[in-house]
């Protein structure tokens, strides 16, 4: 028993005399996370639309103010979402309308995020359920007062998108009932051949 005690003391002495310092970088700091880390996690979805992100507002805070609102729902590995991004990326008119005329938001449903929407915190999944997002892309157009004007599932060309945004920003068109609005859009699409 005495031998074990002496051996333990010798081992403890050698360990205490060791000059190596513990590398604090390999130790966990517990649940403390930096603000940069939190921001990076919240912006993971930005990489999925980085080529057009400058035309959209931060989707964590969806604001209804004096401008109409457009929310585009997309997903990873969605061919038509990529095609829509390409259309936006290559059309200055659409870029200008998205940035200056609308409060525009791009939400990738492949990522979990919390959004401030309708004065409450709502997850991406809850928003998708609220608007019955079954297919991507889906474009949802709102009045500044939060009335849903149009839910458009599927791809929309840049020319049709620009025309749709121009028609839906007009207050007189925002007051039309659903049938009248669809008729107005259909006739405009036909006239402009988009």
Report each predicted region and the residues it spans:
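A short beta-strand-turn-helix
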Residues: 49-69
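Solvent-exposed loop/turn segments at secondary-structure junctions
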Residues: 75-80, 88, 110-114, 146-147
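Non-catalytic, surface beta->alpha helical segment in thiol-disulfide oxidoreductase systems
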Residues: 87, 129-175
């Amino acid at each position: 028993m005495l031998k074990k005690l002496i051996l333990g003391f010798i081992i403890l002495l050698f360990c205490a005399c060791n000059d190596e310092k513990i590398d604090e970088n390999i130790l966990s700091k517990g649940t403390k996370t930096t603000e940069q880390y939190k921001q990076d996690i919240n912006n993971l979805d930005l990489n999925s639309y980085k080529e057009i992100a400058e035309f959209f507002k931060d989707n964590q805070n969806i604001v209804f103010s004096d401008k109409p609102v457009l929310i585009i729902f997309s997903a990873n590995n969605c061919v038509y979402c990529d095609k829509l991004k390409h259309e936006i990326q290559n059309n200055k008119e659409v870029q200008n309308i998205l940035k200056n005329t609308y409060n525009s938001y791009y939400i990738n449903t492949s990522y979990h995020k919390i959004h401030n929407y309708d004065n409450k915190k709502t997850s991406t999944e809850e928003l998708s359920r609220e608007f019955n997002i079954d297919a991507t892309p889906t474009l949802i157009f709102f009045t500044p007062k939060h009335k849903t004007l149009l839910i458009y599932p599927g791809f929309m060309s840049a020319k049709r998108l620009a025309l749709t945004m121009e028609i839906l920003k007009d207050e007189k068109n925002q007051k039309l009932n659903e049938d009248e609005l669809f008729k107005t859009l259909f006739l405009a699409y036909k006239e402009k051949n988009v």
